[in-house]
Amino acid sequence: MNPSAPSYPMASLYVGDLHPDVTEAMLYEKFSPAGPILSIRVCRDMMTRRSLGYAYVNFQQPADAERALDTMNFDVIKGRPVRIMWSQRDPSLRKSGVGNIFIKNLDKSIDNKALYDTFSAFGNILSCKVVCDENGSKGYGFVHFETHEAAERAIEKMNGMLLNDRKVFVGRFKSRKEREAEMGARAKEFTNVYIKNFGEDMDDEKLKEIFCKYGPALSIRVMTDDSGKSKGFGFVSFERHEDAQRAVDEMNGKEMNGKQVYVGRAQKKGERQTELKRKFEQMKQDRMTRYQGVNLYVKNLDDGLDDERLRKEFSPFGTITSAKVMMEGGRSKGFGFVCFSSPEEATKAVTEMNGRIVATKPLYVALAQRKEERQAHLTSQYMQRMASVRAVPNPVLNPYQPAPPSGYFMAAIPQAQNRAAYYPTSQLAQLRPSPRWATQGVRPQHFQNMPNAAVRPSAPRPQTFNPVRPASQVPRMMTSQRMGSQAMGPRPAAAGAATGPAQVRGVPQYKYAPGVRNPQQHMPTQPQVPMQQPAVHVQGQEPLTASMLAAAPPQEQKQMLGERLFPLIQNMHPSLAGKITGMLLEIDNSELLHMLESPESLRSKVDEAVAVLQAHQAKEAAQKSVPSPAVPAV
């Protein structure tokens, strides 16, 4: 197949340069007049869910897609002209450079549409873009023709021509690798020399006297300000490379007017910035290699902890080279770093200190990672979790049911069997059983609206509450209970369990022993008082420890914690117990264990959750008074 004449049987369009707030509904309203649409998807960041600025629109008929491309290209959506082109899924064809030309020295007034109109006379254009930043056009752009011949015609006719009274350069597109190779070759044959740090009393004549002995120069210039005062640097352009090289070799580092001057090859600003960036990255990489496996990241620090206290807590595990609590405005930011002299000491500190309560909070301790490594790790975890989601045939029984897909699908798309992604609220109400930690004869009010409670990756993140999610989304905790009950069958209640509000139907309860994660802290066991204890008691059962929780399957960990949190929270706020339980389950497991041991900590978090719920309800009440915009019917 000839790559210069591709076919587009899928009738799929790429829509770029989108405003961050553009949604699938807006694009449907814009493109639906061109013909029936199969699907629309705005591409978003996997972690933040923010728009990446482009989308794909799939039509039923190629003729409709072609009509949209011809009539809607560069139309304005939310104040920005959008750029439409055929979707090319083969990256090798997009990046080959065949038919792609580069234009520079463009006038600021030339935009995508003006560039398209100028070059469309030479052939069919696949893509056309003027590169811009926050200040507007950067003065260059690219035009990708369908054929190589059209690109050659455009270069032949337009190179050196005037566009808006500016002479433009038009040439074949070159990759960064090709450009860097050319720049490296030119750098070896340089003739322009840069001199700096020679003081303010230097002028052109004095500089000429110093450098003319190395060979004939085309120009010599000392840079001055508006008042004619020297800026302390200048340039000498020689006729021959050999003369310039000799001047650099002999003059660099010499004293001139009592100052040591720098003499070297003159570089463009972009080239100099690239070199400095490369040196900085190399230094950073060397530093990370030196501290690999010995530098620890510690978060959830108490506000009263300083550098000395942090060093004291970690000193039993080895020799500490540095310990630092990160501060802002004289106040702790809640995290810090501890660097040991060997990886073995650091590993021991992670094993012993992770989850240990220091002051009033359980610490999170892990090996320090670069931002890029941490993002890659989180992305990998997210993709693995999503892969496990897709492996379950019926999504309504999936304990990790994600939010509805970001794509905007029309009814014309045939759905796969057992993949119904959306259920009416009335059907969901019939599918939801009672939670396994509900009291006998009592169902918590609004429990079906409990926020998301899926197991989260154990990466650093702030402990905040998510807003209440709509009832149309299947709560993950509910579905995880349903999965567990179907897989294992009903669990018999423990014999001798105390009756009353704290009794859990069909689920054995465990006793939490205070201080089990910190054996060095000897705390007397409190006598059992129903509903006032941080632990739930059942005779003949072992206390639940952090190791027992870690040994449980991931889908059961939050369930085990929720079964013990719910009766405690129900005693404080009976009508909101379901919602508050779901909100608290967003917190790390180590913190949840601490709350079960500490009634004061649990009450503090519950009060905070109640405040969040009240604020959310007030916001919803305010939004109901404002009419919502109409959404196109599907």
Swiss-Prot record:
RRM4, together with the C- and N-terminal regions, is sufficient for RNA-binding. RRM 1 has no RNA-binding activity itself, but improves discrimination between poly(A) and poly(U) in combination with the other repeats. InterPro entries: Nucleotide-bd_a/b_plait_sf, PABP-dom, PABP_1234, PABP_HYD_C, PABP_RRM1, RBD_domain_sf, RRM2_I_PABPs, RRM_dom. The gene is pabpc1a. The keyword Protease does not apply. Residues 11-89, 99-175, 191-268, 294-370 form the RRM domain. Belongs to the polyadenylate-binding protein type-1 family. Interacts with ybx1; interaction recruits pabpc1a on C5-methylcytosine (m5C)-containing mRNAs, preventing their degradation. SUPFAM superfamilies: PABC (PABP) domain, RNA-binding domain, RBD. GO terms for cellular component: cytoplasmic stress granule; cytosol; nucleus; ribonucleoprotein complex. One of its GO terms (molecular function) is poly(U) RNA binding. Keywords: Cytoplasm, mRNA processing, Protein biosynthesis, Repeat, RNA-binding, Translation regulation. It is found in: Cytoplasm. This is Polyadenylate-binding protein 1A. Residues 541-618 form the PABC domain. The keyword Transferase does not apply.
